[in-house]
């Protein structure tokens, strides 16, 4: 409560004493401002509304005619508006330029005030829309994100009503002031406006606006062509006169004459009707001035002969009486014609001072044909009508913004919104706002805006004063002598015109200049190397590194250096070379000067510190150096104390970080192809497999049951196996398709896989090596810089333009980074590259950082983020140096002729780090960490294989019995042959011929009977379905033929006895003669055979075969016993 009471008391005091309190409140920090008034902002719709009345178009006359008509007097009044017929805006005017940006400085095609020879129409309505659109783009103009809105009065042909071509600006909008007041209330005031902008064209309209402001207590700002005299000073009614700016030429010219004590003068007029009344009145009111004569050459300009004879007579008459000639109404062509003629025929007296009384355009000033000592003045930009309208709107916006920070309710909520109920409080919102209007000053588009005497808003342009002099090379050049500000001349420095006239003969053959140049080591702009044994530089320029800025020490060192007995210590000598040294040498050759070069003692660019400038700026200001050539950034603070040439190198600020190599993550082997490519490959694979299956089963030559009696079936699983084998280059056994279409599609898929695999292989090595990680910073506005986390370190070079930018734009960030700032750029780069690094980010000029990145042998540096703070490098010179314009002109020529490009290619043409060639073993050597993902993938495969095994058992034990018992879908050959056989376990293979060397094929629970070569009948009785390797038993059912099995003995009798023993005594079960089952090539049995082979028959046959095997085993055992006994008997007999 105490704090609120203090602010309330301070606001009341400020209302009583506005001027001093404006300075006090300017120093109040933003943190102490009024909290955001949410309810007030909601009531006004987050917008400040400004009303607009008297929006009829203006029709202006030519400058000369209009000013001659009214005598050029700013106070001339007209009760009736100027003549002219109002017309609606043409399609090409008005809204066609409403989208112009603020920095565009006006709409395209805008006419400058007073420019042109014919009448022109000014459109207040369009100018207001243009001003509101531009001002709403200015950040921070209004607090709390408020916006400006203009409420236009609905008049004839204006506002939201249809245009009326018959309307005339001369006809009054309302018949009397009270009707006008009522109309304003009903159309503008009811919408809650903070102020009114008006464009009156007569004294009667001014009186109406006086009435509105007095009755409704609303500030009114009238924009008029001429200042209207008023009997009463109403603080609520201000007027901005456009004619004030047009009549300033006379004030500037009189000030120039007074400054040089040129009180005796003559006038030379190129246009007879040119208005010089203002100038004549000013000189007549000053008793020191004496007008000798007026030379009017208007009638003689058409003929060169007449002009020559006329000037010869007139100038001869004033040769001994007039030291000064002031010219009015002359364009640059006429001026050049007059001076060339005077110089050629010697008409002009040698000591005559020439002054151009009219404001000149700086872009049109030339030196050819003009005399030395000529004085001119002008503005860098010419004001247009729209600029004054925008400045008036900005004046209201700034006043509202200042008032809102003290009492937002009184500043934002209009006191008058109903004319029938006008509040009679002690202090209305309009009266409160008018006090801030009277104390608001700013630099606008039309000039310096300020309020004089509480009712007159003035827009004063700063005129610059130029003098034509010779430069040190003997060439004419325009030198700025000063400026006209606030009604007086503020001189810079330079040679006075009379001094130039006195010494002009000395500049025709100037001596060679000798300059002292200071530089600063900054790669690639300035390098240094050691001198040779003799203290000389075989290449580059000899420079001194004295480690001091003392001018006396430098004088002694350079004196000793140029003397015959050189005593400068060799430790002070260096060889300087680089981008800027080449530029300096070229400038010295073209401008014919010599130079001494030294390195700045403190190694700083220059900053204001401890009450003085340091570094390069300090050397220039102290006179130690005449020129500073290095990567010298042009900024506002330096430009205010020294001169800069036009920039020879454009750059910005950047952020440098260090990269770190890391191993590729687990899924890095997938990175060579995008996930969409992987998805596309596997989708294409399965689609190809489907089409391969369809083509094979629909073809008459396919590997299908309906095909050409094939032994195998090409199913969908076979197609998948083919596609996967081709994709991964697997050399496993596959069943290729047999039809022609399938083979063509398979080869097409192989080509597709070849290109995909080669692309993957080409990118795999680069990906598997690993990526480089770094601090990702989006730019200077990155949260890591504004809210640095624990341990995040960043800095810049001390007393550099980068530090100055951060200090002014981001004070809190600058306070944090001060501890990490480094003395020079190489130090910051080294801090980044150290292990462990001392900096995480380094902010500096991007031109310097790019070079450091390009020469980094380890490829550890990288610039990140968007560039910011666009700036340029210029050559620094002492203030008001006559060399500034000449060097700037030469730099422009170097740019246009390509010399600067040659320097850039020479010193920046370094092979980028990313394009260097490294050893293959260094770049592509990969360990197990790079393939960790593949090992993980293999482990996952092992786990999936276990799941697959479990799935097979689930299918075999649960799914197959259910399909057998309940499902009617028993045919699965098109999907999987193995699955089909598992469902159909009882079928007979067809009878096939057998041979001695051919293996008999297996079957399930069936007997195959084959004929051998000796017509022996062999029977095969396989086991039940026990697996792929089935036990086969051969039965010799007919051994009485010639091709019988025999045992071989040494004794022929025994051999015959044993060999003829047969197994016919073993009763074999009678064999049934069965018809061969009719089978297809894929093993599918006929339905009749399946029904005939019952389980009981098979069991009986098995039992019989078991008995046969038992008997054969018994015979074999007994036979073995006999053979062993026979062997023992033979051995006993032999012994």
From Swiss-Prot:
| Intramembrane region residues | 716-727
Topologically, how does it sit relative to the membrane? Multi-pass membrane protein
Q: Tell me where it resides.
A: Cell membrane; Postsynaptic cell membrane; Postsynaptic density
Residues bound to glycine are 631, 633, 638, 801, 845
Q: Which residues lie on this side of the membrane: Extracellular?
A: 27-674, 762-932
| One Gene Ontology term from the biological process aspect of the record | dendrite development
- Chain coiled-coil ranges: 1085-1119
- SUPFAM superfamilies, alphabetized: Periplasmic binding protein-like I, Periplasmic binding protein-like II
Chain intervals for the UniProt region annotation (GIT1-binding): 1082-1115
Q: Which residues lie on this side of the membrane: Cytoplasmic?
A: 695-715, 728-741, 949-1135
* Signal sequence region: 1-26
Where does the sequence pass through the membrane? 675-694, 742-761, 933-948
Q: List the disulfide bonds.
A: 537-575, 543-576, 859-913
GO terms of molecular function? calcium channel activity; glycine binding; identical protein binding; NMDA glutamate receptor activity; protein phosphatase 2A binding; serine binding; transmitter-gated monoatomic ion channel activity involved in regulation of postsynaptic membrane potential
Q: Where is this region: Disordered?
A: 59-118
InterPro entries on file: ANF_lig-bd_rcpt, Glu/Gly-bd, Iono_Glu_rcpt_met, Ionotropic_Glu_rcpt, Iontro_rcpt_C, Peripla_BP_I
List keywords of the entry alphabetically.
Answer: Calcium, Cell membrane, Coiled coil, Disulfide bond, Glycoprotein, Ion channel, Ion transport, Ligand-gated ion channel, Magnesium, Membrane, Postsynaptic cell membrane, Receptor, Signal, Synapse, Transmembrane, Transmembrane helix, Transport
Q: Where is this region: PPP2CB binding site?
A: 951-987
Q: Name one GO cellular component term.
A: glutamatergic synapse
As for PTM, the annotation reads: N-glycosylated.
Query: What are the glycosylated positions?
Result: 145, 264, 275, 285, 296, 300, 320, 426, 439, 549, 565, 886
Reactions catalysed, semicolon-separated, are: Ca(2+)(in) = Ca(2+)(out); Na(+)(in) = Na(+)(out)
Q: What does this protein do?
A: Component of a non-conventional N-methyl-D-aspartate (NMDA) receptors (NMDARs) that function as heterotetrameric, ligand-gated cation channels with low calcium permeability and low voltage-dependent block by Mg(2+). During the development of neural circuits, participates in the synaptic refinement period, restricting spine maturation and growth. Forms glutamatergic receptor complexes with GluN1 and GluN2 subunits which are activated by glycine binding to the GluN1 and GluN3 subunits and L-glutamate binding to GluN2 subunits.
What's this protein's family per the entry? Answer: Belongs to the glutamate-gated ion channel (TC 1.A.10.1) family. NR3A/GRIN3A subfamily.
Assembly information from the UniProt record: Heterotetramer. Forms heterotetrameric channels composed of two GluN1/zeta subunits (GRIN1), and two identical GluN3 subunits (GRIN3A or GRIN3B) (in vitro). Can also form heterotetrameric channels that contain at least two GluN1 subunits and at least a combination of one GluN2 and one GluN3 subunits (in vitro). Does not form functional homomeric channels. Found in a complex with GRIN1, GRIN2A or GRIN2B and PPP2CB. Probably interacts with PPP2CB. No complex with PPP2CB is detected when NMDARs are stimulated by NMDA.
What name appears for this protein in its UniProt entry?
Glutamate receptor ionotropic, NMDA 3A
Species, as recorded: Mus musculus (Mouse)
